[in-house]
Amino acid sequence: LIGLSKKMLGIDTVEHIEQICESGNLDNVDLRVKDLSKNHKYPGMNEDITASNFGKLSDIATKHDIALGIVNMVSETIATTAIFAARAHGLKNIVLTGNLTTMPHVRAVFTALAPTFDVNFIIPANSQFGTVIGAALHPFK
């Protein structure tokens, strides 16, 4: 997230990315199912699901829209990778940890994708410290 944001927008902190994507609009960036199905040809499908990240990047897209597009793309990549890994092992519950889990837009992506793919994303309290706790406990194995 930081690398893409720094390269594309010159923004290099999660806090600034969070702030700038608050007023972003994915309609100016991502091609979604609703753009492909004007007549609602896919009943029961979430029409806000992304068909192509940055597939509808508009010349009117603002820095805010692009920041939200980056957050959305990174979140969807994490979510779909986790979903495929869970399915490979017959699991439906996916526990998420790390700093990104504290971002409201990241959480919103997981919330939106969970019912579509019939999984449960679990974000525990203090999830941002999960990777550090794992590293600290590793020597005790």
What are these regions (language model features)?
Residues 1-9, 13, 18, 121-141:
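Glycine-rich phosphate-binding/hydrolytic loop that grips phosphoryl groups
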Residues 15-60:
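Conserved ATP-utilizing enzyme core subdomain
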Residues 28-29, 111, 136-139:
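Short low-complexity, flexible loop/linker segments enriched in glycine and/or proline
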Residues 43-93, 124, 128:
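Adenine-nucleotide phosphate-binding core of ATP-dependent small-molecule kinases
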Residues 99-104, 128-129:
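Gly/Ser/Thr-rich loops at beta-strand to alpha-helix junctions
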Residues 103-122:
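Short acidic, glycine/proline-enriched helix-loop-strand junctions
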